[in-house]
Amino acid sequence: RDLMDRSPDDPELLKAREETHTGGKVAEILSHMHPEGYWGEPGAGYLKKYFSIVWSLITLGQLGADADGDPRIRLACNYYLSHAMTENGQISASGSPSATVDCMQGKMCAAFLDLQFHDDRLEKCFDWLARSVTGEGVAPMGTKDTSMRYYSGKIGPDFQCGANNKLACAWGAVKVMLAF
């Protein structure tokens, strides 16, 4: 749409979007989705890498799939948020705040935007993403009297990452920028 300077209701664009969901790679990926809305194993779905719900949603977004145009994608997005999002908006590989890292939070927030998925819960996800980078309103990792704190994966502001020897992570920074 953007490359061709088309309006959202352009008939040719609408036809192309419909065809995206009924043929090609989008249809192939959707054919492997379980009826409950996940790929691979149930749950937060980071693993099996490149075959689980995380990777399927990212790929669908990059291929131009649209949650408004296909109820299966909306189902998968809802399933994912229900299993991977914590009470403070962290997107987690396991559903626990300790399994949150910038790269995954950024990739998934960007994927939801790419998929045109609109849900009030995403406000918390983007809020956590911004706060966790700046440190605003987020307690240090050792603080145990609040859940709005850094954990072992996302250990501090400025893209600090437990998987990157507690250093800033360029991979995570790029994914966060994609989301914003």
Where would I find each of the regions flagged by the language model?
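Preference for long, amphipathic alpha-helical scaffolds in soluble/luminal domains
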Residues: 1-180
